[in-house]
Amino acid sequence: MKKIILIITLVLSVSLAAQRDVKIELPESYELGNIILALTEYGKTDPYDVQKVSPYYDEIMSYFEPVKDHPLLKKVNYSRKDWKKFLGFRTDFYAFSFDGNGLLTRDFPFNSFGPKEVDENLELINDFVKKSNYRAFYKNHQQFYHSLIANYKEYYYINDTYAFLDKIAERPANEGGKKYIIAISPLVGGQNCHRDINSSLTVDFPNIGEDLILGNLKDNLARRILDNHTVFSEIDHGYVNPVSDKYSKEIAANFNLANWDKNSGYPGINSFNEYMTWAVYDLFIREKFPKEKTDSLSAIYHKVNIRRGFIAQNLFSEKVIQFYKKHKSLDKLYTPLLQWTKTTGKKISQPSVVNANNKDFKKVDLSNVVVQFTEPMKKTATLQLRLFEYVDGKETNNTVFIVKNPVWSKDGKEVKFKLDTSYKNFELRFYIWNSIAGFYSQNGILLNPDNYLLLSS
């Protein structure tokens, strides 16, 4: 372990005097991987996987302009379907550092996923480092990196997070002597991950909030609470997973993946743990921020997790909150919770829009738009929709549209409304991730977030 720490050169880190020996790092090698991905065509055009906060992002685009055509950038130009290669490329850089000759070399075994993208492209990476003069860029931004590291603990409530988790669950039994590191980069957007590097080291690779990047530490508490979710839901895996392991047989018998999970990619107990870690976050913010409208903040993240495939996150979290009020212990609520998941799972069904995801634009009367659903929906007084305009087959604009006084059918399976828009051809979407509003079935399940209708006026 000492070898790992000593070998990594120019690693900016600061220990947190918290309940744990937590270290925040912004390693030179890790930032190199993030910058390379940001410079690819996918990194520049995808709105999620690379965070593009100015002025840092703009400085990267300007500084590395002379090497924009370097062959490495085409070689590692991954797409959304190549997410394992993308995320593996980013995180595997953590196992590398620069040697005395300025060459990136592997320090220890670590491969986040199957593809060994860094190893296979090492020669091109070192050529890119040399021709771009990357190490000078990293050195010149140390003051900025230091500010992110120094402010991270306060911004993300690290001390409070551990204090809460220690209260509701036992400290992980294998924690003694184990080091926990949070590796950060201002460029990480989506695709966070939590990895056990070896038996003595765990590293989280979360994104960081825009306010932290810009140094806005005191304003917008709601935004900070939302940002806290990313690191909290990784840290609490260390508490949730061991408890789940104790109940692994009960989870297998009472948590039917076919009912609760829609293609999340998390098998068996791992899917349950995702549900639980997000529910524990809801417990934390309710207790830590009693004066804030935490139910609204939770609703936003429930929708995010639902889109990941955990289609009943809102119902699951509500039940965890209910049982926690009685038991005040994570361990003790598992038995009643799993009894509930067994009976409730049989009733879970994700509603959809009838004839959704059509391939051609369908003519519609904007004064009387009719949308039908596969099952009865909750009859809301307003509808929140997102419209994407298409001109010559390309998306040109989009807007959020609020419909007042929609007309619902008696059974809740149809709604009629007027759309006041100048768009000729547009895509009608029913899912807006950062809004508490949404289309929910009468059983409380969110409408399939990937449903849309192609319409024409």
Label each residue range with its predicted role:
Residues 106-109, 187, 192-225:
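Active-site scaffold of zinc-dependent metalloenzymes
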Residues 219, 224-246:
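Active-site recognition of the HExxH zinc-binding catalytic motif
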Residues 281, 290-360, 365, 378, ...:
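Pan-zinc metallopeptidase signature
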